Structure formats: structure tokens, C-alpha cells
Amino acid sequence: LNHIKRVEKIIDNVLNKLESDEEFIYKEKIACILHDTGAVLGKENHAYRSYLFAKDYFINNDIKFDDINLILDAIKNHSDGFETDNLYGIILIFADKLDMTKERLSYYGKKVKGNKEYSHVNDIDITIENNNLKINFITDGEVNLKEINEYYFTKKIFKGVESFSNKLDLKYILLMDNKEWKI
């Protein structure tokens, strides 16, 4: 639940900075709330299970709105759909991948090489001005850059930022403690 709240906060922050309309933000938050419901049975194939849950939920509760299929597609493809043309999808991917701070890590996650380096990330600052996106990972100064850069999920974070930026025609830079971060 905390992950969902943090992803929702990123979505709200970013979409307000982009001056998105309230209806779009509302629908994006629906995708956010439902995107990991399938993870209760494990991470493997959780995006597809989340999609099935959301689809059944909408049908069983007679929830209908235009672009509901785009919301369902965003949920279904949020794990690896980096090449999507679905704006809901790319925003969900972006926000979901960016939620990698010490708050997200489980006890066991802190023991995994590479992943444990995110336990040193205290916050993420996102700035959007004049078509420039700046993402600054604020740490306690103890991050092992070699380990974090080699970790598979770091590549997903960078890919999510790149895809989001390309879709919205933004120039982007990732920073760690105000220094450019490249992998």
C-alpha cells in the first residue's frame, strides 16, 4: 500500500507540473491504485494478474468511462511496456520505476546486491521546467555506484525515464546527489 501511495504522489507531482487536466490525473491514479493488485500472488506475471483483476473489478461494479481500455493496457504493461504509445502506460511505468528509495525495500531486498544500494536513497526530487526533466536521487552518501549501476532494476529506471521523456518530448538528466548519474 505504501508503494501505491508513493507512486500516486509521483504521478500527482509530475502531472501537475505538466499542467494536465484533472480528469486525466484522476484516471492515471486509477491505473496506479490497481497496477500491483496481482502482486499479492508474487511478482512473476503480476502485471497481467493486475490487469485481469482491474478488468473484472470494472465489469463487476459496472464502471465505464472512455479510454478504460487504455487504463487496463497501462496496468497490463507497466512492468516492461517501455515502447508503448499509451500515455497512461508510460506515465505509470515512469512513476512506478522511480519509486526506488529506502522506503520501498523489504528486509530481504536490503540483502540483494545492487538492490540494497537503494536503501541509501532517502528521496527523489523531480523538476520539470522549460521541457527539461531533472531527477535527483538524494542519498546518505553511502551508495556503491558500481553495484547500483550493475543492478538490473537500475536499467529499468533509466529506461522508464528515457521512454517518458521521449513520449513527452522532454530533455532529461538523472542526478545522484546533484551530480550527473549515468550507467
Task: Describe these PLM feature segments.
Residues 99-183:
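Terminal helices and disordered tails flanking the catalytic cores of nucleotide-processing hydrolases
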Residues 3, 16-128:
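Divalent metal-dependent catalytic cores for phosphoryl transfer on phosphate-bearing substrates
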Residues 6, 10-14:
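N-terminal low-complexity or amphipathic/hydrophobic leaders
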Residues 12, 80, 166:
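Residue-level marker of positions within ordered structural domains that often coincide
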